[in-house]
Swiss-Prot record:
Entries under SUPFAM superfamilies matching the protein: Nucleic acid-binding proteins (SSF50249), Translation proteins SH3-like domain (SSF50104)
Similarity remark: Belongs to the universal ribosomal protein uL2 family.
Xref: NCBIfam families: PRK09612.1
BP terms from Gene Ontology: cytoplasmic translation
Ribosomal protein recorded as keyword: yes
Alphabetic keyword roster: Cytoplasm, Ribonucleoprotein, Ribosomal protein
Name of protein: Large ribosomal subunit protein uL2
PROSITE patterns (alphabetical): RIBOSOMAL_L2
Origin superkingdom: Eukaryota
Disulphide bridges, residue numbers: none
Major localization listed first in the record, in broad terms: cytoplasm
Length: 260
């Protein structure tokens, strides 16, 4: 019998330990309170830091508690143009400036925003990676919802009370710079997850993978497998409708879908 293949080893059944060493902390908005619902709070950016495993930089913002003498420190996903010493305003009556946090109902249509909440008070879900942004399309005051365009191009309707940050996430164009050498990829994935380097199945021995073995690297049989194939056999094109290059009508349909 062959060995357990990679898909079986990474499957359910083992204790997962997240790669969180040296992480600075979760990046999210302040907890929604009375001050943000009815006015605004003023904070100052004390430092802009790098978070290992995250493409976008983080901004450490210090607020004063509205009802007691104390300071509150939060980590925000930094927007393009943020700087140390900048004042950040969070709340319903904050001004429309890059880095400020307002509810969607206070944003004009066509504005560029980032770190958008999905539900009121969840502290930011959408458009958070480096260079990402969402666009406010329209408001519906009748049912209190707002339609936004996400970085993927899909449209989504969220409550108008959801908060978001004005501007685009910093670090845009990060993926356009080539890795150039394996050492850079090693350091990148070392702080992310155990997924590098990834050996191809055809480069393995037959005891290690269904695609392994042979005098030259080839699968040796059809790469399509059934949907109900057992673990260890279920590798390749799972329940594939077709194989090979897209030609003719299929290529035209795929090109039309990419443009949409």
């Amino acid at each position: 019998m062959g060995r357990l293949i990679r898909a079986q080893r990474k499957g359910a059944g083992s204790v997962f330990k997240s790669h969180t060493h040296h992480r600075k902390g979760p990046a999210r908005f302040r907890s929604l309170d009375f001050g943000e619902r009815n006015g605004y709070l003023k904070g100052v950016i004390t430092e802009v830091i790098h978070d290992p495993g995250r493409g976008a930089p983080l901004a450490r913002v210090t607020f004063r508690y509205p009802f007691r003498y104390n300071h509150q420190k939060e980590l925000f996903v930094a927007a393009e143009g943020m700087y140390t010493g900048q004042f950040v305003y969070c709340g319903k009556k904050a001004t429309l400036m890059v880095g400020n946090v307002l509810p969607l109902r206070s944003i004009p249509e066509g504005a560029v925003v980032c770190n958008v909440e999905h539900k009121v008070g969840d502290r930011g879900v959408f458009a958070r990676c480096s260079g990402a942004y969402a666009i406010v399309i329209s408001h519906n005051p009748d049912n209190g919802t707002t339609r936004i365009k996400l970085p993927s191009g899909s449209k989504k309707i969220v409550p108008s009370g959801c908060r978001r940050m004005i501007g685009q996430v910093a670090g845009g164009g990060r993926t356009e710079k080539p890795m150039l050498k394996a050492g850079n990829a090693y350091h990148k994935y070392r702080v992310k997850r155990n997924c590098w380097p990834k050996v191809r199945g055809v480069a393995m021995n037959p005891v290690e993978h269904p695609h392994g073995g042979g005098n030259h690297q080839h699968i040796g049989h059809a790469s399509t497998v059934a949907r109900d194939a057992p673990p260890g056999q279920k590798v390749g094109l799972i329940a594939g409708r077709r194989t090979g290059r897209l030609r003719g009508q299929a290529a035209a349909t795929a090109a039309k879908a990419d443009k949409a």
